[in-house]
Structure formats: C-alpha cells, structure tokens
Amino acid sequence: MYSFNETLKAGLTGILFALLASTTQAAEGAAMKMVPDPDVAKLPGVAFNQTLADSLPASIKDKKAIKVATDLTPPISFQDEAGKLVGIDADIAAALGIILGVDVQMTNVGAGAAIVPAVLSKRFDMTISGINDDIELEKQVDVIDYMYDATTIMTIKGNPLGIKNMEDLCGKKVAVPVGTFQARLVEAASANCATPMNVMSIPKMPDVLQAVRTGRADATVNGYATSVYTTENQTGKGVGLQALPDVRLAVGYLGMLIAKDNPQLRDTVVASLQHMVESGAYPAIMEKWGLGPLAVKTVKFNDAASMPVN
C-alpha cells in the first residue's frame, strides 16, 4: 500500500533553476533541427554508431530524419530568448541525432494534450517530452521511460492553510486532472486518511491549477521539477501558486512516446539511450540541467506498473 513517506531515496538537492523563463505556446511551432551545443557534442559516446544506425527502420533511413513532437515544460524543455529549443530534451535529441546519423527535427506542438495525438496521427515519428507514464497511456502508445519525476504539492501563493505534507491534505479539497498519475497518487493517499480528501476530478491541468488559484480547491499535486521552477519564478503555470519543494512524493517515469506499430524505432531509441547511459553522456546531460537525481540507470519501456502508484 502506498505510504505517505514514499520519497526519493536520493534527495533532489542541488536543483539548478538558473534557467530562462518560457511560456507554453498554444500554436504549433516550426520544426527545428537539433544541433548539439559544443559541450554535448564532446560528451563520451556521442559519436556516430554504425550498429545502432543500422537498426533504424527503413523509413527513417530513407529520409535520414526523425520527426519529434515536444511541448514546453521548463526546465525539461523550453525556449531561450532567441526562440531556440533548449533543455534536457533538446540535448538528448541532438545527441541521438549524432549517434544515429540522422537529423532530429523537433516541433513544439503546444499544449501537452497534443502530444499523444501527434504520434497516433503519424504526423510525428515519436515524442521527446516530459509526459508522465502510466498504465493507461501504455495501452495507446509505447512509452520509453527515460527519466524519473517526483511529485510535489501546490497551493495558492502564501500557503494560507499551512500545508506541509500529504497528511495535511486529509479532509481538504484536492483538485486533480482526470485519469492521470497524479489522480491515482491522491486517491491512494486519501485511502490512508482518517478523514478522506475531497478529491475534485477536473479534465485539464490548467483548470486544476485555476481551481487552486481561485480557492475552489485547497491544493493539487504536480511534477516536481516544473512545479518548483514555475512557482519560484512566478512564470507560466506557476503564477499565483506555491510549490512545496521539501515535499517529494512517489516517483514516476517521464516518457518518450512511439506508436505501437513501430517497435523497430522504439528498440533503436531504447538501445541508443542505454548507450548514452553507459557512456556517461546521459547522466552528464541530466546533471547539466540540475536534474541528476532523476536520471535512470536502465532505460526501459512500458514500465509504469513497477512504480509505487500507477
């Protein structure tokens, strides 16, 4: 059974939030070829690998490009002042392009809700985006679990109810997006309360956050890295809200998405990422962006069932 004290064994200390602010765009952006920064290109293992390149599907080899959908989720993926995509996802994408000898073309498709349809419609070969893996998502697409994410609590700015932990949410109104990892986390936690939480299921995350801003809900839970960054900088989805950085709840995965009828691309990407893990390139990228504690040691796919709450 889920415990309130389920936390990351390695504390997410040293998170670096000296990043440029960005705002998620509603409109789809133009495709950008991911060109690695010099520091990424020099990382160990970031070099053309013939064996991995040979394992690509013929369709990718023919066009010499992988079309990737993403969305803006700082600090994982965002745009700098010049409009260039930067962050963990951009660096990983650029490194994959070098290793596989193809152009990786990333397009910001706007809201996170557009990510799954981007793959199912076959407009894109895959996504590289900080989307939470769960068993329901895995029924639609294959999910490559490429990093962990913790979850934290968000309240209205100032935290007038003095919420400090999940126990403090017992008996409170807690808004969650329908059918998500966060919803299952809250429901599991509420089952341990003497007075259950009043769980408010709301279709979209922006409306969940608005419910907290307006006082309809007392709190919500959301991804740790994004919540802390946007609230500390009072930018984007974090405006008017406060995250609790000392609260690091059950770990889940963030995943890349690939259509289920494309196992050859999935397996090539998994092998390429594992190559980056073992060479040291992947952990170096995670450390560069201050998220080293969220790095995986083994790249798996469709592994949500192994998480504490799924």
Task: Walk through the language-model features, giving the residues of each.
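Ligand-binding cleft/hinge of the Venus flytrap
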Residues: 80, 93-103, 182-201, 232-236
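Periplasmic-binding protein-like
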Residues: 148-155, 234-271, 292-310
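A ligand-binding cleft/hinge motif common to bilobed small-molecule-binding domains
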Residues: 113, 130-138, 185-189, 218-250
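Extracytoplasmic small-molecule ligand-binding "clamshell" domains
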Residues: 29-129
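Flexible hinge/capping segments at coil-to-helix
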Residues: 156-174
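Alpha-to-beta junction loops
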Residues: 102-103, 120-129, 172-173, 213-226
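Short helix-initiation/N-cap motifs at beta->coil->alpha
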Residues: 105-117, 161, 199-214, 250
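Ligand-binding clefts/hinges and TM-proximal coupling segments of bilobed small-molecule sensing domains
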Residues: 33-50, 181-199, 239-240, 273-310
